[in-house]
Amino acid sequence: MEPINDSYTVVSRKPSLTPSGWFGNSKDMIVELENFMTPEEVEFLEKAAKSLTIWDVTQSHVNENGTVVYDSDYWKDRVASNPSLDKNDPAISPVIAGLFQRLKPIVEEFYKVEVVPTGTTIVKWMPGQFQKPHADNELHEGPDAGTPNDFPHYNISRLFYLNDDYEGGELYFPLQGVQFKPKKGAAYFFPGDRNFIHGVTEIKSGLRFTCPFFWEITKHTGERQP
């Protein structure tokens, strides 16, 4: 990595071993597991999320072409990954990690892969915030379309939803024509490439809390190989 000023760092990322578009573009690749979390897990994590006071401090990144691949200002004071979670309450991360392990065999069987998860994270969404359609592991438009973003190993995206006492904040997939308000306690997963760009509609009121994390594919186990 090469610093270019006080605000941005140039980064170069290696592509994933899984080609973009490997999983096609069917809406059937977007999976909902309703009531995946137990009532006790939901209650604990919702309360923990609403009590967070320590958030990550990060730096924005650009690629070799000067395109922003991670904007730290957008996420300021609303993302708590593992180190920040531990400073808030060391009991939080083990509960989320337990969800990872329970979901792992389901994801591996569905996509015919072996995966490892990224770290534990809770994200807060406040009124007025939204997210434009994006892919999780690559850039999807302009001259950099198809090149890695800051997270090329985010092959499969996964979200746990911790609350539903807010308005707006729907998850949508414009290429598949899918839009819905995620259900409290549910798990969702889908491919991270540009065939599954997705966004979040504006939060109108209340606070929206999610546990996003991602799976890196380390091996393809099906007959079809990249």
Language model regions located:
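Non-heme Fe(II)/2-oxoglutarate
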Residues: E2-F110, T121
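Preference for well-ordered, secondary-structure-rich cores of eukaryotic proteins
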Residues: L33-F36, D89-F100, I106-V113, T121, ...
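Short beta-strand segments enriched in hydrophobic/aromatic residues
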Residues: M37, A49, N137, L162, ...
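Glycine-rich, acidic and aromatic/proline-enriched surface loops and short helix-turn segments
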Residues: S51, P127-G128, Y161-D165, D193-R194
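Conserved short histidine dyad/triad with adjacent acidic residue
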Residues: V123-F151
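Catalytic core of Fe(II)/2-oxoglutarate
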Residues: D144-G146, D150, Y154, D165-P226
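Short, well-structured beta-strand
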Residues: Y154-F160
